[in-house]
C-alpha cells in the first residue's frame, strides 16, 4: 500500500513564485495594477493571439464570452456533453438554450460528423454558436469546425481550460496553438490549481477581434469605461461611463504576478506531463481490460488528464482510493445531471458521452 497519498492533482509552487507574489503584495497595487496587463501580454504572446483578458476564473471568462457574442434568451448553442458544467452553464446564464452534440469515442471531442448532421436537420439560423472543449488537453481541430461553423453562420467559443500549450496541425502543415484566435472567436483558459498554470483561481480569455476584446474588457469591469475613444461624452480625465450591465470579473495583481511566474515554466510543465503520460502508457499497455487514450500524430496533447476506460470503474476507483491513489472520474455526463435532465435531456441521449 502506498503510504504517501497521491492526489488527483496539485499545484507546483516555487520560491520564485512566492517571491513574485510577495513583491506584488508590497507594491502600490493589489488589483487593477500593472501586473494584470503584463500577464495578459505574456499570455497572448505564449498562445499567439492578439488580445488576452485576465479574469477571476474561467467560468467568468466563459460567461463574458457568451455575453460578448450576444447570447440572448432562447438562442440555441451547441455544446459537448462531456465537460465541466461551466462550458454549458455560460449559455444558460444568458438565457440561451443548450443543445448537446455527442463526442467521438476515441478522442472524447465533439464529433464533427454528428455536428454536421445536427446542423443539417434544421434551417440555417436555428443555432447561434458552438462551444468546443479541448477535452483532457486534446486539441480540437478548429480549422475543420471553423469551416462548418462558417457554412451555418455560427461563432465558436473554445473552452481551452485543459489545453494551454496544446496544438493541432492544420491542412497546411502548420501548428495551430489552442487559443491563438485563428479559428475560434474567443478561447478561454483556467488557472485553477490542478491546471497547467495556477493562480489559485483565475482565467484568461483570448481573441483576435478588437471588437470582441473591447466588449470583454467592458463587461469584465461593471460595463464601465474611461477610454476616451469609447465614451459617448467626454467631460475630462475624471469622467467614466457605465455603458452596459457588466460584472466584476477582475483578477488581482498578486494572482497575475503568480501567473507570470508560472507561465515562464509552462513548457517545462508540459514536458513533464508528456513524460508522465509515457510512463502510464508503458505501465498500463499490457493490462487486459484497460483502454488507453488515443492520440493522433496531428496533435500535441497538453495532458491535463490521462483518461483510461475499464470494465469495473467503481471497483477500480474504490481500490485506488483505499490505496491512497486519488484518481477521479471525468465527467458525470452533463446532460444527465439533474439540472439538465429537467430541461428535457434523458438516458440514451449522447451515448458517446457516457464513459
Task: Give the role of each language-model region.
Residues 37-41, 49-52, 113, 129-133, ...:
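PLP-dependent aminotransferase class I/II
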Residues 83-88:
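Conserved coil-to-alpha-helix start sites within the AMP-binding
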Residues 89-91, 148, 254:
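Hydrophobic/aromatic ligand-binding patch that stacks against planar heteroaromatic rings
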Residues 106-199, 204-212:
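Active-site phosphate-binding strand-loop segment of PLP-dependent enzymes
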